[in-house]
Amino acid sequence: MPPVQTKQGDLLATLDGTMVVSCQAEPGLPLDAPGHIAAMARSVVLGGASGVRIEGAANLTAVRAAVDVPIIGLIKTKRGDTEVYITPTLDDVTSVIAAGADIVAIDATGRPRLAELKAMFSAVAARARLSMGDVATLDEGRRALDAGADLISTTMAGYTDYSSDQHGPAFGLMEEFARAGLPFVAEGRIWTPQEAVRCFELGARFIVVGGAITRPDAITRRFADEVASWSARPQLRRNPR
């Protein structure tokens, strides 16, 4: 299917007040294959997701052929010359758009980078797509919007060395964005429907939920850890009849 054919403002209107689901798999895990990612994307759309967030050109191509909802696209590249790894180069921007993304997610943290943020966001706009700056702090959000980002998200909160104390959704950062009057997308460690609703109460335009829905290994581990913890307390076990 081609990218969603709509004006940029209309595309955002379709996402406002809704949930996007991030369909990704860690390298080496059983679901790490374009066909599996596409099936995952179809499944979450059937469940009510208004859009999907997809990593990698091959996965983007497969998902674009499978769903007709907006796609947030990115490429993760670990490099030795920068800590920035979400769509770090202009070539990555080109690849993400060519593979069918409607919105391009770009690491917009203040860490040393290979390409100027303004040039990255301009490259997205020149191809009639929207850009999302993934940030970890209020100042980074401001800088991303000033550089031309169409959206900012809390994606990187808790994933930089200066914001690594996050254990749940970045509610504090969301409150800062709201007080500053900056529209934002909530993403990162949203594990429950109640946390999802709280993001909207704090002013999120839309939310992105990932591992709580699309990582069976992580979901299973949460259950297994609780079961193991209970099993370690034999005095709480019921006697079999």
Where are these regions (language model features)?
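Glycine-rich phosphate-binding active-site loops on the catalytic face of alpha/beta enzymes
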Residues: 24-26, 46, 75-79, 99-113, ...
